[in-house]
């Protein structure tokens, strides 16, 4: 809808930058908020921003008053909401499933996100056709309400546990040691805090390298790849190329969960990344549509596997008092560096 109104490639590029830059700059700060305050409330704040953005889009579409600066502001707020949500969400997953089942929890979270990638365009397209862009995006805002309401009293999170302990043992949450939230110096301090932990540093750098040098850049170039493979836009073949990676990731989530495969080990993560690089290279070089489809499917399979593995290894080894900051540092690397994907 935005592209049809403005026909601006620059705005389309800004939408990508506005989505990833907040992860790069503010993930550690978002993690610090999750360390200091209740992660449930931090997630709710992020969802509130998403709801506000969706309602604003709906109003502007309905009133036909959308201007370029409106789009820029809303895209920035949307990116900030995602950066605010991510570290707190991973902290809450850790608290819900515990350390032993953490990889499973992270993997299922990634699988549900992949399912959203597969089904989201279909549902969004259906709403667009059924009720139009304005009411479609307003209905989208309502999707956040059930999770927001559940989080209000959800019996999970450090704040909930410490409240229970305070009731039973005469302690209060305020007595727990927390570090003050600083500016950008927090990023460097967090890096110093974990500098001696080889697993955290290596997994953070590995995830960052994947995002920086490849990331999702090949998705943006898919029209050119598809043209070389004889699959023009708006055809089944083009759609198959776009969704092959997500289908592979969904298969990974299901198969690895059923079989309890791929225990979190740093060496395994490195091997998977190397294999993933080979598959992406094969996709870029092949002239066969069917081989390209196979390469993308298995690349998606491995991507979900090594992403969940690196995330798990970092969370398991993060000190309790700064777990949010460490998760934020990892998120800044793994998601924030996608700003420069394919450099």
Predicted regions located by residue number:
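Hydrophobic alpha-helical segments of secondary membrane carriers
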Residues: 108-116, 206, 329-334
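Hydrophobic alpha-helical transmembrane segments
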Residues: 68-75, 79, 104-162, 243-248, ...
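Conserved extracellular-gate-facing transmembrane-helix segments in secondary transporters
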Residues: 86, 117, 121, 210-219, ...
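MFS-fold secondary transporters
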Residues: 3, 56-61, 78, 150-151, ...
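Juxtamembrane intracellular "pre-TM" segments in multi-pass secondary transporters
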Residues: 156-205
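Small-residue-rich segments within alpha-helical transmembrane domains of MFS-like 12-TM solute carriers
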Residues: 79-87, 215, 300-308
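Helix-loop boundary and gating motifs at the non-cytosolic
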Residues: 1-24, 192-245
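C-terminal transmembrane bundle of multi-pass solute transporters/carriers
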Residues: 24-29, 36, 40-42, 49, ...
């Amino acid at each position: 809808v935005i592209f049809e109104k403005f026909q601006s490639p620059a705005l389309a590029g800004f939408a990508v930058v506005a989505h990833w830059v907040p992860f790069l700059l503010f993930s550690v700060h978002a993690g610090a908020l999750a360390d200091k305050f209740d992660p449930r409330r931090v997630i709710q704040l992020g969802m509130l921003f998403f709801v506000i953005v969706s309602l604003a889009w709906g109003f502007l579409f309905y009133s036909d008053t959308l201007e370029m600066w409106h789009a820029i502001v809303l895209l920035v707020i949307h990116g900030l909401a995602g950066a605010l949500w991510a570290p707190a969400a991973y902290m809450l997953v850790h608290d819900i499933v515990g350390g032993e089942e953490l990889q499973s929890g992270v993997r299922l979270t990634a699988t549900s996100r992949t399912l959203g990638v597969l089904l989201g365009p279909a549902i969004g397209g259906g709403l667009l056709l059924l009720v139009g862009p304005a009411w479609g995006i307003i209905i989208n805002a309502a999707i956040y309400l059930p999770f927001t309401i559940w989080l209000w009293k959800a019996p999970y999170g450090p704040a909930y546990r410490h409240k229970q302990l305070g009731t039973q043992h005469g302690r209060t949450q305020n007595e727990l040691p927390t570090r003050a939230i600083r500016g950008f110096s927090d990023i460097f301090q967090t890096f110093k805090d974990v500098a001696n932990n080889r697993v955290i540093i290596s997994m953070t750098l590995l995830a960052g390298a994947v995002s920086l040098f490849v990331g999702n850049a090949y998705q943006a170039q898919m029209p050119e790849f598809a043209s070389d493979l004889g699959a023009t836009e708006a055809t089944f073949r083009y759609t198959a190329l776009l969704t092959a990676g997500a289908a592979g990731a969904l298969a990974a989530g299901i198969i690895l969960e059923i079989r309890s495969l791929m225990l979190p080990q740093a060496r395994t993560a490195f091997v998977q990344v190397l294999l993933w690089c080979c598959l992406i290279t094969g996709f870029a070089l092949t002239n066969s549509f069917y081989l390209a489809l196979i390469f993308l499917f298995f690349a998606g399979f491995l991507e979900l596997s090594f992403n969940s593995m690196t995330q798990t290894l970092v969370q398991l080894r993060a000190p309790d008092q700064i777990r949010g900051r460490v998760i934020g540092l990892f998120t800044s690397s793994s998601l924030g560096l996608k700003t420069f994907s394919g450099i």
